[in-house]
Amino acid sequence: MTQHSTYSAAQAEQSNQEWLRFVALLKQSFDNDLHLPLLTLLLTPDERAALGTRVRIIEELLRGEMSQRELKSELGAGIATITRGSNSLKAAPPELRQWLEQELLQAQR
């Protein structure tokens, strides 16, 4: 292994640990009803809007009534963002997909 790849592996591990720390903190904030102030503190208005758009992308992909190009026009998102959402949804565990369908689609009926 080269020094560069060792550094990259260590950096990836640190990044993963930071992500898991964030997830744990977010869970604790929900348990203490502090999730909205925490997310407002950590995310810019643009980042919050982007997350909302990503949820809409997943929702519409699950619904299956619009093409990716139609989603691009409807949501103002880039085609690459929509394609990543589609690919991620295809790779998602079945139980997550089922839960998302229930939360995003059936909750509206």
From Swiss-Prot:
Any Gene Ontology biological process: negative regulation of DNA-templated transcription
Name the UniProt record assigns to this protein: Trp operon repressor
Family from the record: Belongs to the TrpR family.
Molecular function terms from GO: DNA-binding transcription factor activity; sequence-specific DNA binding
Keyword hit for Signal: no
DNA-binding region residue numbers: 68-91
One matching Pfam family: Trp_repressor
Function text: This protein is an aporepressor. When complexed with L-tryptophan it binds the operator region of the trp operon (5'-ACTAGT-'3') and prevents the initiation of transcription. The complex also regulates trp repressor biosynthesis by binding to its regulatory region.
GO cellular component: cytoplasm
Subunit structure: Homodimer.
Transmembrane segment boundaries: none
Localisation: Cytoplasm
Keywords for this protein: Cytoplasm, DNA-binding, Repressor, Transcription, Transcription regulation
Predominant localisation class: cytoplasm
